[in-house]
Amino acid sequence: MSLSVTRENFDEWMVPVYVPAPFIPVRGEGSRLWEQQGKEYIDFAGGIAVNALGHAHPALREALNEQANRFWHTGNGYTNEPALRLAKKLIDATFAERVFFCNSGAEANEAALKLARKYAHDRVGNHKSGIVAFKNAFHGRTLFTVSAGGQPTYSQDFAPLPPDIRHAAYNDLNSASALIDDNTCAVIVEPVQGEGGVIPATKAFLQGLRELCDRHQALLIFDEVQTGVGRTGELYAYMHYGVTPDILTTAKALGGGFPIGAMLTTQDYASVMTPGTHGTTYGGNPLATAVAGKVLDIINTPEMQNGVRQRHDAFIERLNTINVRFGMFSEIRGLGLLLGCVLQTEFAGKAKLIAQEAAKAGVMVLIAGGDVVRFAPALNVSDEEIATGLDRFALACERLQTGGASCG
């Protein structure tokens, strides 16, 4: 018999690094979730841009169950068919020639930064170790990636941090140019800063970074953990900009909810990662890669990408209508189905309160700092789910504006 659990048990048993919602989801289907008491939610959070095809997608369940009936794990002393097939799909769909599989976005970024340092050390010398990243970025929670992230809130308690990492202002090419030099081994950037406020890069900014990296023989790393796998209306966001990175990291939506990450790069750069230089026990396991292969099959189609663009327009239209009613947002921005509503000054710092009110109204949303409400729904969210979910979101906005909101 299963142990009966409640939300209070989290506070009793778990390390307190999270403050979860007061309800526990127990079942999902498409873009809907149900909690223990049966209340329904429209899910516009998507597991933080992970559940690209919603909950319990039948094709993903079939892929997982089929592989689970064969074998689950062997370790990196052996390869497996699903991993090889997924690698080929990623290579065929992108600039990449080589793939490294891991379990998360942080691990993918860790691998990318290690590769960049090793490539520079092997080809130039150990003095070429500098990494340029951007303020308010987010690249993961390992010591290396949290240091690259440029958000002191996440890193200040863990000093001393890895050296030779400097941070420029995002979307400011002059700021980046002042830091990138011949001692720089890599520049790591998000095409859309997610945690930093859902801020798309300008084309001129990314093109300028590409030129600076070429000039100084530094590798350009695109962190597409949040923007990748169809989220922006292209398979990867770099395709919007006409700027090709040297290394791309991907995770989140790649597994559709099953943990997987990947680092993509070229043969030349990959060649320095010789046997033993890096590794992972679970990365590229057959369960994860079988599911991810099916995710890619479904998402990497013109129909799906066109659908993302159409759903983007539907969200923008309805969010603008909500804003006409309540005047809460100074800007609605983003690409595809990664959207951010920036709060007006009078509502500054209340993004979390809005998210809490939205949950009470039956819709799950995210935040990106204290001043931005973030949406990252399933890419196949239906018109009805968009309409119903945003009606519920409008109710939350009304409650906040009229003073009916509470912090409970």
Curated annotation (Swiss-Prot):
Point out the coiled-coil segments of this chain. none
- Essential cofactor(s): pyridoxal 5'-phosphate
GO BP annotations, alphabetical order: alpha-amino acid biosynthetic process; arginine catabolic process to glutamate; arginine catabolic process to succinate; ornithine catabolic process
SUPFAM superfamilies for this protein: PLP-dependent transferases
CDD domains in alphabetical order: OAT_like
Superkingdom field: Bacteria
| Residues that span the membrane, as ranges | none
Similarity comment: family membership: Belongs to the class-III pyridoxal-phosphate-dependent aminotransferase family. AstC subfamily.
- Protein name (database record): Succinylornithine transaminase
Which organism was this protein described from? Answer: Salmonella choleraesuis (strain SC-B67)
Q: Which classification does the entry list for the species? A: Bacteria, Pseudomonadati, Pseudomonadota, Gammaproteobacteria, Enterobacterales
